[in-house]
């Protein structure tokens, strides 16, 4: 379906997306078209803010709909992220941006966005499942790699 995204500053773009597309994927496409970083975007439909994890169909957004884009000032975004982010929540944004660039070389924009979203979900799930034993094992491997190598050689005989 065809959508129009209009920024309050007057710029706008038309996008072709499936009706069940994720809002986060739409934001990625808007970022590419209007050169507005995803984290500074706030998309509105009929005055209601759209949540990244929801699909366009969840808001009854149909063909030829018009969405409004509010561009949040970078300072405000950084303050929000700093206040709401725990240290282990996610790797630095630069890591995700680098992964996104690599994916963009090998996939279409929509596919790259979906792969990146899945990687981020898998990363969060893996972190949330770490036990204290897992963390101790990882720490031992980093702090004492020679012991780990010796143990692995002993098992392979």
UniProtKB/Swiss-Prot annotation:
It comes from the Eukaryota. Residues 96-138 are annotated as: Required and sufficient for interaction with BAG6. The modification Phosphoserine is found at residue 90. The keyword Transferase does not apply. Residues 1-76 form the Ubiquitin-like domain. There is a cross-link at residue 48 (Glycyl lysine isopeptide (Lys-Gly) (interchain with G-Cter in ubiquitin)). One of its GO terms (molecular function) is protein-folding chaperone binding. GO terms for biological process: post-translational protein targeting to endoplasmic reticulum membrane; tail-anchored membrane protein insertion into ER membrane. One of its GO terms (cellular component) is BAT3 complex. Keywords: Cytoplasm, Isopeptide bond, Nucleus, Phosphoprotein, Transport, Ubl conjugation. Polyubiquitinated. Ubiquitination by AMFR and deubiquitination by USP13 may regulate the interaction between the BAG6/BAT complex and SGTA and therefore may regulate client proteins fate. It holds the Pfam family Tugs. SMART domains: UBQ. Transmembrane segments: none annotated. It is found in: Cytoplasm, Cytosol; Nucleus. Its main location: cytoplasm. As part of a cytosolic protein quality control complex, the BAG6/BAT3 complex, maintains misfolded and hydrophobic patches-containing proteins in a soluble state and participates in their proper delivery to the endoplasmic reticulum or alternatively can promote their sorting to the proteasome where they undergo degradation. The BAG6/BAT3 complex is involved in the post-translational delivery of tail-anchored/type II transmembrane proteins to the endoplasmic reticulum membrane. Component of the BAG6/BAT3 complex, at least composed of BAG6, UBL4A and GET4/TRC35. Interacts with BAG6; the interaction is direct and required for UBL4A protein stability. Interacts with USP13; may be indirect via BAG6. This is Ubiquitin-like protein 4A. It comes from Plecturocebus moloch.
């Amino acid at each position: 379906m065809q959508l129009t995204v209009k920024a309050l500053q007057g710029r706008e773009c038309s996008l072709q997306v499936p009706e069940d597309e994720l809002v986060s994927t739409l934001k990625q496409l808007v970022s590419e078209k209007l050169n507005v970083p995803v984290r500074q975007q706030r998309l509105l439909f009929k005055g209601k803010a759209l949540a990244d994890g929801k699909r366009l169909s969840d808001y009854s957004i149909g063909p030829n709909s018009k969405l409004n884009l509010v561009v949040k000032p970078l300072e405000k975004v950084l303050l929000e992220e700093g206040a709401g982010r725990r240290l282990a929540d996610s790797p630095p944004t630069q890591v995700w941006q680098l992964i996104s660039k690599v994916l963009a070389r090998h996939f279409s924009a929509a596919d790259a966005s979906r792969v990146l979203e899945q990687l981020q979900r898998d990363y969060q799930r893996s972190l949330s499942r770490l036990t204290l034993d897992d963390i101790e094992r990882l720490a031992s491997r980093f702090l004492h790699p020679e012991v780990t190598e010796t143990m692995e050689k002993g098992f392979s005989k």
